[in-house]
């Protein structure tokens, strides 16, 4: 993106600030939803962290993944930092995959959301239930973990749309279109 004037720089700074404020407002709302209700609710912060990672660089992605992971730990009563490490790793991986290989398509997000959510639910089950060899521990995976996984995937659709709605007017253009290049060259 070519920025010519200080006015354009101020507009870019303003849009970026508003975009990040809205991102973290969504994160806070999802945290509130996760802390209320019953045991069977989606882990909303996983799709939020992944959606934010799709559109940003590695550093913003790892920070957002860590913050969302800490909030998951707080809302679920897990070991502090457990989900932060998992989400920080996956947010870096998702950011790099979208930067290097994938296009920003809905199906790509849904597949990645399903995979990351499953891995997170599986690790949660493995380290909090199966490792202690409780009786009938497989029932917890089938009746609790898998339902939470499905709810998380379904909620990913709505979160993707919300983040897309935020990004549409506020995300800076990374490339100039042919028309913009022609208009720029005509002015010179």
List the predicted regions and their residue ranges.
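Terminal, non-globular segments
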Residues: 1-188
